[in-house]
Amino acid sequence: MFTRNVFTRRSLLAGATALGGASLLPGIAHAKGSLVATTYPGTWEDAYRSIVVPLLKKKDDIDLEMAPLFAMDQIGKAKASRGAPPFDVFVLDPGPRIVAIQGGIFEKFDGKKLSNLSKIPDGFADDWGVCVSAQVVGIAYNPKKVPAPKGWTDLLKDPWVSRLGLTGFQTTFGTSSIIELSKQFGGSLTNPDPGLAELKKVLPKIAAVGLPAAMPGLFQQGQCDVMYTNTQTVATLKGKGVDIEFVKPESGAISFYTTMHIAKGTAESANAYKYLDLVVGKDVQEALMKAPYNFLPVNKDVPLAPDMPMKNLDEMASYVQHDWAKINPLRAAWIEKFNKEMAK
């Protein structure tokens, strides 16, 4: 019975996507002991299917169905579902999280329902959800090809610029990196133009310009030897035998947090809290930190791996963070400008 119900629900989700909306989704019911949670395609999906799905079944007898969707696709489907959420739990980065809060698609969150609340740093749970993974963004480089860059401006100088892999504002790490680069040339949180102008000057020298998802492959293939990225990507490539190291820029590494949220109108709130409690628990966080997944944990009882860029989670409070409420309204125009001016 359960398999049929969830399969039908996901089939309708896929069908609604093909038809350009999720209007077919209202009224789909869960089987007892089930939960549908979104996940990011790729490493997130692989990790959660391998680790979290079986653990949740074993611990709480909940059948977890993963729906792989990028952040804005999650929000779009939830808004189109007209109050009958196609899934019960979202996973989002800072920018989309604010869009979703403004769109009213989350249930209010009660962190006291998590038995592991005391195991995560203060402020990692709020009225809307809980942080489940940390991200640290800086510069990756091939130590056999180029010396370690010291800061963002080095990326526009020799020998780094001719080996640079450049990507735009489509991702959180790309947006954050270009903002920090722009600050070195007089730009600001809401004005990346000075940085874009400098990039345009050296564009003919840049090794590769591509979509964010393509950058790890380009680096692995040797088509670029320097890029801005997160520690998870660096650890994953290193695990594949790629010559790659991570450096924190002199002006500071960037940090942000990936959060999970309970969908407004879900009938599976109790199961959702059990799922979130498991995700931030020591066992899951420790398993996710290991290769080949290389997540940065949020549970204070999990010792950080030696190759992490900090000794403990408290250090991240000193890292650069951005106000996505100010970035979001401007980001679409930035993406358009980058795609127009930086295409090679």
What are the residue ranges of the model-derived segments?
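Mature extracytoplasmic/periplasmic domains
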Residues: 263-322
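A ligand-binding cleft/hinge motif common to bilobed small-molecule-binding domains
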Residues: 95-101, 220, 225-243
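Short beta-strand->loop
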Residues: 107-115, 127-130, 226, 242-254, ...
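N-terminal secretory signal peptides
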Residues: 1-7, 11, 15-24
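Early extracytoplasmic/lumenal segment of secretory-pathway proteins
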Residues: 32-94, 98
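Extracytoplasmic ligand-binding site segments that recognize negatively charged/polar headgroups
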Residues: 42-49, 86-223
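Periplasmic-binding protein-like
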Residues: 135, 197-202, 240-264, 300
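A bilobed periplasmic-binding-protein/Venus flytrap-type ligand-binding module shared by bacterial periplasmic
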Residues: 138-145, 180-183, 257-269, 276, ...
